[in-house]
């Protein structure tokens, strides 16, 4: 992580632009109608804001993660203090909302509100009562990746649990999973256990693997 934090901003922007170009050419992206994209942290990972803009401009439905105020069952005091145990993917309606309607959590990550401006509940991708109908594609963040689908997350297991939920809710049509990596994030092998979910595709500035 220390190495990633030292990558200059201009270098992240250059690599991110190449990554986004490759994502836009993926068949799983072209086919997808509902797309979940993580919003990048200030440093150390592929910047996804431009990808989010593309999703909205192309008429696809965009969902981004919300971590706070989502509780599923009992959690330890530390986990409850740090963050809730799970995340939800909530729909962003338009570019205006993406650019100006989000708030930043303590990690410097932008998040959507639970409700829209008119007070109605925001659409949750996995909650049919809010209009959600599942996801076609999930764009994954991480700290390190290998070329075999291995992904090292930030240690809290949010995405592994979320992917498990989507597979249970969408057994006939699980979402495609695409991880985005800077060159500095690619390693020989990422250790993983049974709880870790492998990703279908890894996209780097140099192509898709």
Task: Spell out what each predicted region is.
Residues 15, 19, 158-159, 198:
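Internal, well-ordered alpha-helical segments in soluble enzyme and binding-protein domains
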Residues 46-53, 148-164:
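Short Gly/Thr/Asp-enriched flexible loops that form oxyanion-binding sites at enzyme active sites
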